[in-house]
Amino acid sequence: MNEKEKVNQITEGVIWKQLLLFFFPIVFGTFFQQIYNTADTIVVGRFVGKQALAAVGGSASQIANLIVGFFVGLSSGAAVVISQFYGAKDKKNLSKALHTAFAFSIAAGIVLTVVGIFLTRPALLLMKTPADVVEDSAVYLHIYFGGMVFNLVYNMGAAILRAVGDSKRPLYVLIITCVLNIILDLLFVVAFGMGVTGVCLLYTSDAADD
């Protein structure tokens, strides 16, 4: 077994220690994800106003979470297949699975971008979004859908890294992104006065950086 094959072999050595080393970065990642989301809410609520907070955290947020949750599930499914090929050292099928997973993420992201932008307003009205926040919610979702490809590719990439036993690199990326998010939240929303648009542009640029 060469050096590359020894990387991220979580079943080697003392199993419970390896599992804890794999588990804790995921837990901390969830913590930083909550900080990421909370920072947006605090900055918008404190410096923009109730209407903007309702636009970011209301129906628009529910639609965004629904889409992300769906693709996190798909990423987890792809990760199961990839982990099986990785564990079996089946490099041929592993390569095919990786290419298929990323190609699907890109294709689905493009489709969702187009469909989402066209259906944003009807979806908000269907959810009985208050009239005074529909416009800001629509702006938020239009920009959100514009960055959908980056979002899906990141989620797929993070799931694949965890599938091969590497839960640390997704955590490092998330920590860096979280810190940048807080700094740029204040810059875009407070200094530049961009409001809801600034928050969503920041989300999209962070997803691209991921």
Where are these regions (language model features)?
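Helix-terminus/linker motif at the lipid-water interface of multi-pass membrane proteins
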Residues: F31, I35-A54, L124-A131, L187-V196
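Residue-level signal for short hydrophobic patches within transmembrane helices
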Residues: W16-I35, I63-F70, G146
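Generic alpha-helical transmembrane segments of integral inner-membrane proteins
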Residues: V27, F31, I35, A39, ...
